[in-house]
Amino acid sequence: MSARDKANRVLIHFILILVSITMLVPFLWMILTAFKTMTEATSVNPFVILPSTWRWDSFKEVIENMDFLHLYINTLLLILGRVVCAVLTATLAGYAFGRLNFRGKNLMFSLVLFQMMVPGQIFIIPQYLMVSKMGMLNTIFALVFPGIVTAFGTFLLKQAYMGLPKDLEEAARLDGCNIGQTFLFIMAPLTRSSMVALGIFTAVFAYKDLMWPLICNKDVMPLSAALAKMKGQYTNNYPQLMAASLLACIPMIVLYLIFQKQFIEGIATSGGKL
């Protein structure tokens, strides 16, 4: 290895370490603050990093006062609803755009790409009016509604299907499979990694969605909305706020650790052919 290659490798590792530290510091600060007293959490002394005593009172108060189990159930229903709907619709639409030929295909997919470039806040008022007229306000269905179809999911699965060889479909036709059988038994299983990646993306977006739950649903509140309501106008109990935030982070961390292999494979496969 030449001196230039060594220097480039050192520079790359230095940048990666710097980026990792930048991303981990807020998370570590959240963990440490959750165990501190209010005085320690608001101290301006730069040397007060670790708590004097590791207190679990903030976690106990948050669990008792916020009914975390009920919030977890609401959030779980929200995530399951959006993930199932998004993966199902994106798989069907992605296969149609990626493997089938029909009139208006390019125009329709251009509209999908255009929707990806439009800020989601623009659709909030039309979505609210639709949910209101369908009588779904203050129900779990109102939370799931915006995630039934996603332009990003359609694009992701389309790229995954385009990366599969055409020989598979030709072999399936020779064996007597129709379009539905080819899709269900041959093509769809090969894009499982992309489906998992889309499911994780959808779960994360649903988990941190704040504006829509606050607008359309006051009775069935997910974790994101409950955390937002903990923040006061003039004062905040930072240890309790950080304890609640830490408890809210745990499911997403566990989800990613379980499916990180499929997540990386799905992104790599879908981005292999643009």
Put a short name on every predicted segment.
Residues 2-274:
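A structural signal for multi-pass alpha-helical bundles of membrane permease subunits
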